[in-house]
Amino acid sequence: MSRGLRVGPAGNSELFYEQGHKSTTDAFAWQRRLFGLDAFEIPFGRGISMTVETAGRIGLAAREADVDISAHAPYYVNLANPDEALAAASARYLTDSARLLQAMGGTRLVVHVGSPKGQTREEALERCAERLLMVRSALVKEDRGEIRLCLETMGRPSVLGTLEEILSLVRLDGSFLPCLDFAHLHAAQGGSLRSQGDFAQVLDRVEAALGLPRARESHMHFSRIEFGAKGEIRHRVFSDTGFGPDFALLAPLLVSRGYGGTLICESRGTMAQDAAEMKQALARARAGGLT
């Protein structure tokens, strides 16, 4: 592996603000000092308002703290939209996100691929495939070829994003990576990740589809999650032990299989603290022997 597994939060924890901090430029040194975290995901989920100048300042602060930056593109991207104008707007959200991510020095852009919207899933996937390749081509032409689109598994069966759908799209281009959101996988299948064997089956499928070297580079999200009959309801925190999945089951597998991508915690409000718990679980797995 070219690097070890990087671990960090999606956005700033409530604790960050409670301790008097306001600017994300302060977050990287803060999380390094308190928790030893070396990754951070910038949330553009509800829209892009950041300037390139601000992105540059964020990137400088992250580099000074040796924290890897990733970003999450807007949630409302739908590359499967049958309306060409709306699909083109979604593509622009991705290229705009990539422009800011590049200014921050990051390379991993998490993407929700979209929803069928009255089409068959097969038709929607075909549209997604075509438009993902168009976005990739645009990034290369804009000298942003280092940006890797990380296609996310989703928590509701009504949208595109089953593991098999994501893997089929990732195989389209060598720069694409899966974003394995284990909470979403758990929720979309009615609580499917209950044992270490369940997690192993997910990783086995990824490795079979992409090969072990590329699977090891996967971008990953983790939290506990509340779900219902239609899938995901809301992300939960690690102390909400009545909800799964349990990271202690996954940690030994990531260590024994040599995963070295990025692992982001999406707990609600305690993402830095829970990311630190994940980092500690990985350290215990390394120290205590591999399962």
Please state what every model-predicted region is.
Residues 1-96, 288-291:
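N-terminal pre-domain/capping segments
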Residues 10-14, 43-47, 74-78, 114-116, ...:
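Active-site beta-loop-alpha junctions enriched in small/polar residues
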Residues 5-12, 38-42, 69-73, 109-111, ...:
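Hydrophobic faces of well-ordered beta-strands that scaffold small-molecule active sites
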Residues 18-29, 51-59, 120-140, 156-174, ...:
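Distinct, well-ordered alpha-helical segments
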Residues 271-288:
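C-terminal helical cap(s) of enzyme catalytic domains, especially alpha/beta-barrels
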Residues 63-64, 80-180:
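Active-site acidic/histidine proton-transfer and metal-coordination neighborhood
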Residues 1-2, 27-36, 50-70, 96-105, ...:
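Acidic (Asp/Glu)-rich catalytic clusters
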Residues 134-232, 236:
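Acidic/histidine-rich catalytic cores of soluble enzymes
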